[in-house]
Amino acid sequence: ALLVDGKIVAAAQEERFTRKKHDADFPGHAVEFCLQQAGIRVEDLDHVAFYDKPLLKFERLLETYLSYGPVGYKSFVKAMPIWLKQKLYLPRELNQGLGHRYKKRYIFTEHHESHAASAFFPSPFEEAAVMTLDGVGEWATASFGYGKGNDLTLTHELHFPHSLGLLYSAFTYFTGFKVNSGEY
């Protein structure tokens, strides 16, 4: 999404352009679309935000694997190099995806703050209660708060391993659907 003076002027998902469901590649087409809609260039951007805090999420992953060790050792050894490569080099990937034209710092918001913002800010409400639920972000699995004008405040969180979203995913898997895809 692209905001100008606190107002959403454009938003798009990369999968709409590439026709690949849950496209995990850099959203280059979506970025270009949003910039064109606003009539600006990457160099004109004041901030670029990313939807989670990778190092906070790494803390949860590491703590979870260590608490269940040595049971999860094989999956840890397999998953961590891939995950670390993706997340530790994220600023470099963002720079590359933006053609090295953005010269300022990136902002990393917490996962549930991103969900809450994507629900509240495009809504027609000036003021509203906000609730997010999913499997897990960094540590939070649910968050509660309120939005008013251009301000969003999350006041309470439920933390991993307590998660209605993961329970939902377990039932999704049990009934034969693909987790994080077949639910909707």
Predicted regions and their residues:
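Short acidic/glycine-rich loops and adjacent helix/strand connectors
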Residues: 1-184
